[in-house]
């Protein structure tokens, strides 16, 4: 069983030198720089490091976890150490998910180039592998781990230890019989290809064999006609033709003779079921398939909150890495909190906290570099400007000079249109969202009330929440950091018909016994140079839906805290839906989420809110929903809203959905699982007891969850065979989340893997669900095998 990488590992000069090992400095901070010896392992898939050249080594990283390699000039940390460490000798290993980057500095430019070229080559080889190649590589990795003495052979004792590592509990006599059957050389050990045969016997899938034989006349093969029947009857391929069946046979049948005879063997059938064509996610939804010519407000837009933070909201690190990660995962709206910095250079950080600071110009340069690497559709810079006049001018200069032609600085046709432009019209453009001077605005005097029902404990919570919220157009009751009695708050914005705009917010007057944390007047003077860069996305305060309809325009946008947005959905859900058919809304997390936790974005999407900003640095259920939602449509960051969320006469209310909606019933038979990993390393020696939980997220009436029983001591090939039933009123807004857990009767179940997708992207029939980690990284070959059936209308379980 030769690894797919063996040819390159034995012929490529860079990889040969990497296998010998080299000393490099591992850099974590300005004060932590340690010499370590790094070596590529013989499997070509892992890099180990040791403190000494001949010291005991431990794993550093796996090639499959690496996203890309950057040179030293692109590293914030290495750039800050140029006086000590030459940038030309440094490089950065960037990992998938949320794992911190690894900064390394070699002893010479040549050695740095060797590692950069070699790692690039290995990453390219891994990312180009298909499912079967990944499985072969996975087997090769396990063989390497099981072969303790590295003699290229595995004794039965080594196989037994390996089975335990692979989450397999098996009768010793049965395991030995499989071992003997695979040992064709009768040497008492298994070599490469013998181990493959042992694995095939171990993973023989009776449920797939039974399905195969139910459509095969002779039980040995599927003819073109039989396979066509299977695709049409079970897989619900509406446009199934003999041409489609033949194309799939050519793609997945491993034997040349089978391809010539137009038949599919059992191995080919299993290969099809495990492929992207057999995946639960419809391949037709993977590329850009939606109409991209509608106004921006007709789309859900992937959005990030406090993008510069890679940790918590109080003491976390600010880094351009936050922008890189957000943009590369398809995020199209990023937030930039800008404050006066030293030497006349604006800085970005979470104001009034201990978060670190980065230069505004570095953020802009990062956005310019990464904005369109994943998607060509427009990026929105949500500016929260707290700078002086002078530093606002500096901001405007950086935006103009660094972004150049990428920056949208005028309307597309030079005149004010009647609706927002489309993503297609704004391809590869960067838009600025922020405050804007309007000479025509009249002097207004407004009275705004603290939200009713927020007395006492809730009022105190709201006041504390406001301490950490920095939206450019905050809600009136959240403008001042205070704990106060319910009362009116008076503000008087002054719009001067000159070159600047001065907004004066009057601090509320405290009553006896109330605690004011800040009574200073807040003044913001807006610079025309910066104001002129805001074209289609002028930030305005939200007062009421009636006020917005009467006084605001389509090119204006309001921001809502999650607290207020959820309240509006409950109290005026249909008005919110109609508001979002003609104007953009941005929702941001509560200021109480100082740990950078997230809310469920689905609740806001239900009302048509376009920009639901997430703390993307924090993994969890909420980000699974967000990632799953934007996985469709090419991962471009824009998803077209359902028609009833685009119709300005819509009667839809997310809290009380009524007809006409095409309600559906979903039947899911959870059949089996394959190669489920044991992720909780603290439970050494235990084998997982897996169960599958299925969750529906959508309108409140559709939200539901069910789970299977657990299978004891089998993470390798558990079988459930259980059917779950869900009834969904508004499938257009529904998301499905499949979660595999390790049952524990003494404590909380441990997470193993998940997969989340939109209802509209789900394929019917026999499908594999390829699991992802908490960080959204593939756990290949871990999967669950299910049967999906969708029926029109609401049916009972007996159906």
UniProtKB/Swiss-Prot annotation:
C2 domain sequence ranges: 646-773
One cellular component term from this protein's GO annotations in UniProt: nucleus
Domain EF-hand: from-to ranges: 134-169, 170-205, 206-237
Domain PI-PLC Y-box: 530-646
Chain location of the short sequence motif PDZ-binding per the record: 768-771
Keyword Chaperone: no
Keywords in alphabetical order: Calcium, Cytoplasm, Endoplasmic reticulum, Hydrolase, Lipid degradation, Lipid metabolism, Membrane, Metal-binding, Nucleus, Phosphoprotein, Repeat, Transducer
Residue ranges, annotated region (Substrate binding): 26-53
GO MF assignments: calcium ion binding; G-protein alpha-subunit binding; phosphatidylinositol-4,5-bisphosphate phospholipase C activity
Residues binding Ca(2+) 3: 306, 335, 337, 384
Motif GBA, residue range(s) on this chain: 213-243
Residues where Ca(2+) 1 binds: 147, 149, 151, 153, 158
Residues modified to Phosphoserine: 460
Reaction(s) this enzyme catalyzes, per UniProt: a 1,2-diacyl-sn-glycero-3-phospho-(1D-myo-inositol-4,5-bisphosphate) + H2O = 1D-myo-inositol 1,4,5-trisphosphate + a 1,2-diacyl-sn-glycerol + H(+); a 1,2-diacyl-sn-glycero-3-phospho-(1D-myo-inositol) + H2O = 1D-myo-inositol 1-phosphate + a 1,2-diacyl-sn-glycerol + H(+)
Domain PI-PLC X-box: 290-435
PH domain span: 16-124
Residues holding Ca(2+) 4: 687, 689, 713
Task of the protein: Hydrolyzes the phosphatidylinositol 4,5-bisphosphate (PIP2) to generate 2 second messenger molecules diacylglycerol (DAG) and inositol 1,4,5-trisphosphate (IP3). DAG mediates the activation of protein kinase C (PKC), while IP3 releases Ca(2+) from intracellular stores. Required for acrosome reaction in sperm during fertilization, probably by acting as an important enzyme for intracellular Ca(2+) mobilization in the zona pellucida-induced acrosome reaction. May play a role in cell growth. Modulates the liver regeneration in cooperation with nuclear PKC.
Subunit structure comment from the entry: Interacts with GRIP1. Interacts (via GBA motif) with guanine nucleotide-binding protein G(i) alpha subunit GNAI3 (inactive GDP-bound form); low-affinity interaction.
Listed name of the protein: 1-phosphatidylinositol 4,5-bisphosphate phosphodiesterase delta-4
Species, as recorded: Macaca fascicularis (Crab-eating macaque)
Organism taxonomic ancestry: Eukaryota, Metazoa, Chordata, Craniata, Vertebrata
């Amino acid at each position: 069983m030769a690894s797919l990488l063996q040819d390159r590992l034995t012929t490529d000069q860079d990889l040969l030198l990497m296998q010998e090992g080299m000393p490099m400095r591992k850099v974590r901070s300005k004060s932590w720089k340690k010499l370590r010896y790094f070596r590529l392992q013989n499997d070509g898939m892992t890099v180990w490091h040791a403190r000494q050249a001949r010291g005991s080594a431990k794993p550093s990283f796996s090639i499959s976890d690496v996203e890309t390699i950057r040179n030293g000039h692109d590293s914030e940390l290495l750039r800050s150490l140029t006086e000590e460490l030459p940038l030309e000798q440094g490089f950065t290993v960037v990992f998938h998910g949320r794992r911190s980057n690894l900064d390394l500095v070699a002893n010479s430019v040549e050695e740095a180039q060797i590692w950069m070229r070699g790692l690039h080559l290995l990453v390219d080889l891994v990312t180009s592998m298909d499912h079967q190649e990944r499985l072969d590589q996975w087997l090769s990795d396990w063989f390497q781990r099981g072969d303790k003495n590295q003699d290229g052979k595995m004794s039965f004792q080594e196989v037994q230890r390996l089975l335990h590592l692979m989450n397999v509990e098996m009768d010793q006599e049965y395991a030995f019989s499989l071992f003997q059957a695979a040992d064709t050389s009768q040497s008492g050990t298994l070599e490469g290809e013998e181990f493959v045969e042992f694995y095939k016997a171990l993973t023989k899938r009776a449920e797939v064999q039974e399905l195969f034989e139910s459509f095969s006349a002779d039980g040995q093969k599927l003819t073109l006609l039989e396979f066509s029947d299977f695709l049409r009857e079970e897989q619900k391929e509406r446009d199934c033709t003999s041409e489609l069946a033949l194309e799939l046979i050519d793609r997945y049948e491993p034997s040349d003779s089978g391809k010539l005879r137009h038949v599919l063997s059992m191995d080919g059938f299993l290969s099809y079921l495990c492929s992207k064509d057999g995946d639960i996610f419809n391949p037709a939804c993977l590329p850009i398939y939606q109409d991209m010519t509608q106004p921006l407000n007709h789309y859900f837009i992937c959005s990030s909150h406090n993008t510069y933070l890679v940790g918590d909201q109080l003491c976390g690190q600010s880094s351009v890495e936050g922008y890189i990660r957000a943009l590369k995962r398809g995020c199209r709206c990023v937030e930039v909190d800008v404050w006066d910095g030293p030497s006349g250079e604006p800085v970005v950080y979470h104001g009034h906290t201990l978060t670190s600071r980065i230069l505004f110009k570095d953020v802009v340069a990062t956005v310019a570099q990464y904005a369109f690497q994943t998607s060509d559709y427009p990026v929105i810079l949500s500016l929260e400007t707290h700078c002086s006049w002078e530093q606002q001018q500096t901001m405007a200069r950086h935006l103009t000079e660094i972004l150049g032609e990428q920056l949208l600085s005028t309307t597309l046709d030079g005149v004010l249109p009647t609706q927002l432009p489309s993503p297609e019209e704004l391809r590869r453009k960067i838009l600025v969202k922020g405050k804007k001077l309007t000479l025509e605005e009249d002097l207004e005097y407004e009275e705004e009330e603290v939200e009713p029902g927020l007395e006492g404990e809730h009022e105190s919570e709201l006041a504390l929440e406001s301490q950490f919220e920095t939206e450019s157009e905050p809600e009136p009751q959240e403008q001042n950091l205070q704990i106060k009695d319910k009362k009116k708050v008076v503000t008087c914005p002054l719009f001067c018909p000159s070159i600047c705009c001065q907004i004066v917010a009057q601090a509320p007057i405290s009553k006896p016994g109330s605690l004011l944390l800040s009574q200073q007047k807040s003044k913001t003077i807006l610079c025309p140079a910066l104001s002129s860069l805001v074209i289609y996305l002028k930030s305005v305060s939200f007062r009421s839906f009636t006020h917005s309809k009467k006084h605001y325009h389509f090119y204006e946008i309001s921001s809502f805290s999650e607290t207020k947005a959820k309240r509006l959905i409950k109290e005026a859900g249909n008005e919110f839906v109609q508001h979002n058919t003609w104007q953009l809304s941005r929702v941001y997390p509560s200021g109480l989420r100082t740990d950078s936790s997230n809310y469920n974005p689905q609740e806001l999407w239900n009302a048509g809110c376009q920009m639901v900003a997430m703390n993307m640095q924090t993994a969890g259920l909420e980000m699974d929903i967000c990632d799953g939602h934007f996985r469709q449509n090419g991962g471009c960051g824009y998803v077209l809203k359902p028609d009833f969320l685009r119709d300005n006469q819509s009667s839809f209310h997310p809290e009380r959905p009524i007809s006409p909606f095409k309600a559906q019933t979903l039947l899911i038979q959870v059949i089996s699982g394959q190669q489920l990993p044991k992720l909780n390393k603290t439970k050494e020696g235990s084998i997982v007891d897996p169960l599958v939980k299925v969750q529906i997220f959508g309108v409140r009436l559709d939200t539901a969850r069910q789970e299977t029983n657990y299978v004891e001591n089998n993470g390798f090939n558990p079988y459930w065979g259980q059917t779950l039933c869900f009834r969904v009123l508004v499938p257009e807004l529904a998301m499905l989340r499949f979660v595999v857990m390790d049952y524990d009767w003494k404590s909380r179940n441990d997470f193993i893997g998940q997969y989340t997708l939109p209802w509209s992207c789900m394929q019917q029939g026999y499908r594999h669900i390829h699991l992802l980690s908490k960080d959204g990284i593939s756990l290949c070959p871990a999967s669950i095998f299910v049967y999906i059936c969708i029926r029109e209308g609401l049916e009972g379980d007996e159906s």
